UniProtKB/Swiss-Prot annotation:
Sequence positions that bind 2-[(2R,5Z)-2-carboxy-4-methylthiazol-5(2H)-ylidene]ethyl phosphate: T139, I140, S141, G171, I191, S192
Gene Ontology BP annotations: thiamine biosynthetic process; thiamine diphosphate biosynthetic process
Single GO cellular component term: cytoplasm
The protein's required cofactors: Mg(2+)
Cited InterPro entries: Aldolase_TIM, ThiamineP_synth_sf, ThiamineP_synth_TenI, TMP_synthase
Protein name according to UniProt: Thiamine-phosphate synthase
Reactions the enzyme catalyzes: 2-[(2R,5Z)-2-carboxy-4-methylthiazol-5(2H)-ylidene]ethyl phosphate + 4-amino-2-methyl-5-(diphosphooxymethyl)pyrimidine + 2 H(+) = thiamine phosphate + CO2 + diphosphate; 2-(2-carboxy-4-methylthiazol-5-yl)ethyl phosphate + 4-amino-2-methyl-5-(diphosphooxymethyl)pyrimidine + 2 H(+) = thiamine phosphate + CO2 + diphosphate; 4-methyl-5-(2-phosphooxyethyl)-thiazole + 4-amino-2-methyl-5-(diphosphooxymethyl)pyrimidine + H(+) = thiamine phosphate + diphosphate
GO molecular function, one term: magnesium ion binding
Top-level class of the enzyme under EC nomenclature: transferase
Pathway note: Cofactor biosynthesis; thiamine diphosphate biosynthesis; thiamine phosphate from 4-amino-2-methyl-5-diphosphomethylpyrimidine and 4-methyl-5-(2-phosphoethyl)-thiazole: step 1/1
Length: 214
């Protein structure tokens, strides 16, 4: 799971500024992302279940073509219906124990955490495959984001002896990803770093190898 978290792209229709979600996703897949989470939320997102399912299936097909895990944010029923590779939920989405009961053994389970105690609980549960920790830096992509934690939260989690795979989240781009990895994350998740880039292949290369020339 750790390798799959290296460059974890998150996006929904609401995040796309040029082109379409499938076209942006395919460019990112060609560029080398290692995981994709379909997150359809907020202003500008698809509003009907049928639209979201149709888009999810299109994105899932692209991920399968490039052999990259396809994860759905929050919507357990949709993830189960279409056979997603994973489900990611937050602390205020469906209760994690309910998600585990429905999904464990069928797909990977990711959980957002914002403190050492939440990280400890995620590891204690045993069925959570990875945690998303953040927001590390200020973010424009999530209107309901928690307060910024900085990279210190990653160091605190690792110092506490927590070994569960971690992907850093929130305001991460090619200029600050090295800090996130050095602090203890196994990978970085990005939205605008890819969706707003004129050259996502270069961005992804730098996210995978911080300090490398673009």
């Amino acid at each position: 799971m750790r390798a799959e978290l290296a460059v974890y792209f998150i996006a929904g229709t609401q995040d796309i500024v040029r082109g379409t979600l499938p076209s942006v996703l395919e460019e990112a897949l060609k560029g080398g992302i290692t995981c994709f989470q379909y997150r359809e939320k907020g202003a500008g997102s698809l509003q009907t279940a049928s639209e979201r399912k149709e888009m999810a299936l299109e994105c899932q097909k692209l991920c399968a073509k490039y052999q990259v895990p396809f994860i759905i944010n929050d919507d357990v029923a949709l993830a189960l219906e279409i056979g997603a590779d994973g489900i990611h939920v937050g602390q205020t989405d469906e209760a994690i124990r309910q998600v585990i009961a429905s999904c464990s053994g069928k797909m990977k389970i990711g959980l957002s955490v914002h403190s050492v105690s939440e990280a400890k609980e995620a590891e204690r549960l045993g069925a959570v495959d990875y945690i998303g920790v953040g927001p590390i830096f200020p973010t424009i992509s999530k209107a309901d984001a928690e307060p910024v934690s900085g990279t210190a939260i990653l160091e605190e989690i690792r110092r506490a002896g927590i070994t569960i795979p971690i992907v850093g989240i929130g305001g991460i781009n090619e200029t600050n990803s090295a800090e996130v990895l050095t602090a203890g994350a196994d990978g970085v998740s990005v939205i605008s770093a890819i969706t707003q880039s004129d050259d996502c292949h270069s961005v992804i290369k730098q996210l995978k190898n911080p300090g490398s020339p673009s």
